[in-house]
């Protein structure tokens, strides 16, 4: 009995360590969109200097359901997979995005602008693109 108890305790400890050591994704609801902060966000954000972007997403079955300002994504949150249409709030002008050291937050977006990289759009360094976009989208 003692041996079985020891094995059970050891197994539970190992399971606990494995559970705690796996990457944890945080789910939050933002307006009518869901977004998920992955442990290292989306693969394309690997140059974002550790700043986690807010990626606003909605469920979609196919890329054709996404609007022109959205990107079709297949994201993993924990053990679940989602197919989504997503856009990001970050225009990468202030160096907190994937910035690569360009732009100081005051000038125009550059060739490595995050939105331009994703969607061919142009923002400027102080985030006006998304401020105007979000105002236009939600304040009507």
From Swiss-Prot:
It is found in: Secreted, Extracellular space, Extracellular matrix. Keywords: Disulfide bond, Extracellular matrix, Secreted, Signal. Component of conchiolin, the organic matrix of nacre. Only expressed in the dorsal region of the mantle. One of its GO terms (cellular component) is extracellular region. Disulfide bonds: none annotated. Residues 1-26 form the signal peptide. Its main location: secreted. Heterooligomer; disulfide-linked. Pif97, Pif80, N16 and other proteins form a complex. May be specifically involved in the formation of the nacreous layer. Belongs to the N16 matrix protein family. This is Perlin matrix protein. It comes from Margaritifera margaritifera (Freshwater pearl mussel).
């Amino acid at each position: 009995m003692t041996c079985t108890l020891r094995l059970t305790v050891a197994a539970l400890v190992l399971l606990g360590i494995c559970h705690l050591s796996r990457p944890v994704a945080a789910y939050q609801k933002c307006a009518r969109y869901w977004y998920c902060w992955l442990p290292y966000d989306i693969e394309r954000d690997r140059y974002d200097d550790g700043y986690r972007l807010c990626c606003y997403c909605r469920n979609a079955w196919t890329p054709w359901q996404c609007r022109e300002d959205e990107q079709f994504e297949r994201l993993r949150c924990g053990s679940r997979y989602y197919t989504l249409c997503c856009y990001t709030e970050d225009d990468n002008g202030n160096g907190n995005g994937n910035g690569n050291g360009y732009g100081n937050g005051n000038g125009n977006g550059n060739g490595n602008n995050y939105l331009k990289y994703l969607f061919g759009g142009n923002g400027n360094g102080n985030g006006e693109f998304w401020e105007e976009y979000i105002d236009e989208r939600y304040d009507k």
